[in-house]
Amino acid sequence: MSSEKMPIETLQADEHRFAIILGAGAAGIIQGCTFIREKTLPLEEFQILERQSAFGGVWWKNTYPGAACDIPSHEYQISFALNPYWSRTFAPQPEIQKYFEDVALQYELHKSTTFNTEIVEAKWDDSRLLWLVETTDLTTGDTKLWSCHVLIGALGAFTVPKKAPVKNVDAFKGEEWHSVDWPKNANLKGKTVAVIGTGPSACQFIPNIYPEVKSLIVYQRSPGHVLPRNDVVVGSLTKWMFAHIPFLMRFNRWFWMKKDEILRPRLFTVGSWLQKIVISMTRNHLYKQIKDDTLRRKLESKDVFGCKRPLMLSDYYPIFNNDNVELVTDSVTELTENGIKSRNTDTGEEMERETDVLIWGTGYNPVDFGLPVPTKGRSGQLLCDKYQPELFSLYGVAVDDFPNYFNFLGPNSSSFETSVMELFELQAHHNSIATEYLFQKNVGTFRYAIMPKEERVRSWTLSLRPGQAKLPPANPNCKSYYRSKIGHVYRYPYPYWQYKALIAKLDFKRDWVLLQQRIGQKEVKVLEF
């Protein structure tokens, strides 16, 4: 089948499921498990479509040296699938990927998952009140058209890698890659290596590649706040106790999450007593590991705490004490065939440094919500364009003009206060409630869909703006992916119990409209609840 000659809405689907989940990472796995646990849908009624060849999402894809969780393992796990056997306080990438894969297999999600599948386009078909999803099999090149009532975007925020906006970005002739595409056969032994970017991923792999390289050049735009990692091996006695006395494991997780719930709002309040203490800790950590005053000035963050994601690393700073490591704080301006040009912002002097290997540690584009899958709503507008530039959404899970569409980690839903795993579980439950309603409603001679009210989407988002303006990333000097393209902070700013209460149930009368269509007819009625 080929959809190149005609619009996909004119074609008949090859496969139909009631719900399709895009992505088999943590969010997609939690959504599938929630469907099963809450008896929303049986396995045969939903399908997970995944580009990679295994479960795990970013934890399958990111295999760079030193890849690990920067959140303690006992917090970075699913509440209904606690793992008593974490090896360390901060588990490494292979262990985390296996954990998510094991959870997926436990709930038999492999029976409803199609791997090696590129989503070409997802489009709402108003003539049938269905989503149409075109895919390509990456192993055979075959295309397929799926249809579904409910479409759930579980692709996460860290799927679209970015590079620095520099001149002649494709000019470099040496070896080059982004941290997310780390080659399995990468050989850095005896080579000069340049790293552009000092975000969370770069700060993890830099200490791990240093022993191999001849020399290392690190280009830093602005330093972040760094705290000691305090990563320790979990003892066999602790593992035994967690495995055989599950209450202790649950209490341990509850204790640390409750601590975060109490302390994090204060930590991310600008000028708070706790923030001042933690900033002092970051300075002491830097001064203990770096003795050179010039290096200290380069590595000490000038940002308000919380502008960027704080880092927890104990092996990062010492790398810069070595003679064969150069920290460059000039602005990268251009790539050449043999290296990188940068300009000193004070003197205007430009300098080229040659390198054998260039590694991009510049992270992702989390603010480009709706990417990388082209997803079109009722009007034909792309989801990524619908969100921009104001980032309006309903609770970060839905948006007007996109019926029966739900996603994870959308605008204005993440918070400094809580773990992303808890957020995924909250949003999966919300999506499950909506799906159950639609599953029960779509029987008989009518089809139904639900869609957020435009005025509610706007009013809820705008109600967050006063609180968001007080968050650390709102500082005018802060350059952060926590801000939209026009400067709005898109994190939830208020006590998180309020968000939990909002998303725990669906208020159909306040938030939603009902689309109704008699099967076989094209007229769609928009009804109030």
From Swiss-Prot:
Which residue windows are coiled coil? none
Q: Which InterPro entries match?
A: FAD-bind_Monooxygenase_sf, FAD/NAD-bd_sf, Flavin_mOase-like
**Which pathway, per its entry?**
Polyketide biosynthesis
What cofactor does this chain's UniProt record say it requires? FAD
Its induction, per UniProt? Expression of the botcinic acid clusters genes BOA1-13 and BOA17 is coregulated by BCG1 during both in vitro and in planta growth.
A Pfam family found in this protein is FMO-like
**What is this enzyme's EC?**
1.14.13.-
Alphabetically, the GO molecular function entries are:
flavin adenine dinucleotide binding; N,N-dimethylaniline monooxygenase activity; NADP binding
Keywords for the protein's UniProt record, in alphabetical order: FAD, Flavoprotein, Monooxygenase, NADP, Oxidoreductase, Virulence
Q: Note how many cofactor molecules are bound and how.
A: Binds 1 FAD per subunit.
Q: Where does NADP(+) bind?
A: A68, C69, D70, T198, G199, P200, S201, A202, C203, Q204, R221, S222
Binding-site list for FAD: V58, W59, W60, K61, D70, I71, Y76
The entry sums up its family as follows:
Belongs to the FAD-binding monooxygenase family.
What does the function comment of this entry state? FAD-binding monooxygenase; part of the gene cluster A that mediates the biosynthesis of botcinic acid and its botcinin derivatives, acetate-derived polyketides that contribute to virulence when combined with the sesquiterpene botrydial. Botcinic acid and its derivatives have been shown to induce chlorosis and necrosis during host plant infection, but also have antifungal activities. Two polyketide synthases, BOA6 and BOA9, are involved in the biosynthesis of botcinins.
Q: What is this protein called?
A: FAD-binding monooxygenase BOA2
Q: Report the source organism.
A: Botryotinia fuckeliana (strain B05.10) (Noble rot fungus)
Tell me the classification of the organism that encodes this protein: Eukaryota, Fungi, Dikarya, Ascomycota, Pezizomycotina
